[in-house]
Amino acid sequence: MSGFATGMLALLVLASPARGAFVTLPSPVPLAEKSLDLLRKANPADAPQWQLVVFGFTRCEDICPRSLENLSRLVKLAREEKVGLGGVFVSVDPDRDTDIVLERYTAPLGENTGYLRLEGEELERFKGQFGVEAVFYNKNKGNEFFYQVDHSSTAFVIDPAGRIRLVFDALEDVGSAEKMLRDNQDFFQ
């Protein structure tokens, strides 16, 4: 993805009002092939054509569980509406979110939903593709386990060509996303 496209996406994500904003991007933002490969590996179930991506961490007590519940709801609705949509939860906290922890965390979400655990520069590059930031509070050499993380609750819908097409708040805009799945079948064809 070009620096301009990344910058515009980051501006869109960061400039969104506190209350939700469901946005269909007029110019879809293409993801790098490496990012697309990672998403495909995270959700190999019958290779859904569309991907719904949310970022978070398993020790989050309020925002992430609701985001994941909404992700699961949308994936199930997409199945009912005959839209091939897979969900991917991307951990922003790989130090505490091991594969075992993430597997347990995402298993109740059902089929067509997986997780992605990346570390270091690979995670930073992946988050950068989406304009997502994560801020760690009180994480230091003396406190490597009991810290907080602040991150975006933005959800991203990636089309079969590997482009970000929809951006919305995973907490505030799930109703708009459900309406889009029910009423705009042509969009997903």
Where are these regions (language model features)?
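N-terminal targeting signals for export/organelle localization
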Residues: 1-33, 184-189
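A short beta-strand-turn-helix
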Residues: 30-51, 75
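Extracytoplasmic
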Residues: 31, 47-50, 82-87, 97, ...
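Short active-site neighborhood of thiol/selenol oxidoreductases, capturing the structured segment around
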Residues: 44-67, 71
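Soluble periplasmic/extracytoplasmic beta-strand elements of cell-envelope proteins
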Residues: 51-54, 89-91, 154-157, 167
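Solvent-exposed coil/turn segments that connect beta secondary-structure elements
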Residues: 57-58, 90-95, 120, 160-163, ...
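Structural microenvironment flanking redox-active thiols in thiol-disulfide oxidoreductases
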Residues: 68-126
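Thiol/disulfide oxidoreductase modules built on the thioredoxin-like
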Residues: 122-180
